Amino acid sequence: REEDRANTEAPWVSYVCRNIINRRYMHKRLWINDPDVHIARKDNNELTENEIQLWTSALWLVGGLVLISDRFSTLAPERAELSKLLLAQTDTFDAYPVDLFDREIPAIWAAKRNSDGAPCVGVFNFEDDAQTLDVDLVSIFGKGVTLKDHWTGRTILSDSGKVELPKHTCVILMKA
């Protein structure tokens, strides 16, 4: 299975994610953030489906310049949608790392949507095995709020505070 194979490309994703979230506060203050190129194609790409979704999520949350490295005419429709999301909604959120000093690569990125101030949180698993992360969702969303994952549509209650993630995946939680 694709998810089980060893991936030599994935480490750069976590390192770039560490850099872009740790430097996010400088975006539009000292410079315009310039993360790495977005790659969504299936051919000539070592990233798994989960890793591509994780990378897209990170770019969506931090904003900044968007460089697409794919020919839209050759992209599978579901992959083209990932790139279109980034192009249609640049600088959608104002994000920051909640766990900046708790781990080498921050895994919990809180954000507010710039258009209306609605809260959002990205929870990332950059590790090579499944993780259950404790996330203080109540402080971000309030008590008893139903949250929905942007990618899967799954819902959880903010009171749970536990987010289970397979390796190299993420969720983007917003109010349902």
Labelled PLM ranges:
Residues R1-S73:
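Glycan-recognition surfaces
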Residues N45, V66, S73, S115, ...:
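Short, glycine-/Ser/Thr-/acidic-enriched flexible segments
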Residues W55, L59-V62, L67, D102-F141:
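Carbohydrate-binding surface patches
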Residues L157-A176:
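C-terminal beta-strand-rich structural cap/linker in extracellular carbohydrate-active enzymes
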Residues N44-E46, E104-W109, S158:
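Active-site-adjacent structural elements in folded domains
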Residues V138-G153:
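Solvent-exposed beta-hairpin/edge-strand motifs
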Residues L61, L147, H168:
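A residue-level signal for conserved active-site and pocket-lining positions in enzyme catalytic cores
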Residues T56-F101:
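Aromatic- and carboxylate-lined catalytic core of secreted/periplasmic carbohydrate-active enzymes
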